[in-house]
Amino acid sequence: MAGWHLDTKMAQDIVARTMRIIDTNINVMDARGRIIGSGDRERIGELHEGALLVLSQGRVVDIDDAVARHLHGVRQGINLPLRLEGEIVGVIGLTGEPENLRKYGELVCMTAEMMLEQSRLMHLLAQDSRLREELVMNLIQAEEN
């Protein structure tokens, strides 16, 4: 996975595509717990302590109102680890009543992971294509000399 990471463009794409289907705010946090994509653009750049819990514990974390009051940058909802090749690369959060979101959470997470995998594969294909072009250019230059 070297050379690939979850970026703000991909995070915002996940948010936009998901929020067209589900009527709730979506946040995407990077591997350091920072919000890098959100339906609430004012939250982008904030540290999300709920995401830090997901990253450190490697599991789904439900946040109710009582917990949200004690954590920084957190609202009631559910937070799920985003995995790529078994490694947690970020967190996806759905804002709202955890009990109501649980049924959507896994589906949203699976869809986001599929988008991440597709992006990673496209990156690898582009890299492979560049390496092939470079090899051909080197062979042509070697023949000219």
Give the residues covered by each predicted segment.
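Juxtadomain coupling helices with adjacent low-complexity linkers
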Residues: 2-17, 96-143
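Structured interaction and signal-relay segments at domain junctions
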Residues: 2-74
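Detector for Asparagine
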Residues: 25-27, 79, 100, 138, ...
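Sensory/regulatory domains in signal-transduction proteins
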Residues: 57-114
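Short intrinsically disordered, low-complexity coil segments enriched in acidic
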Residues: 68, 144-145
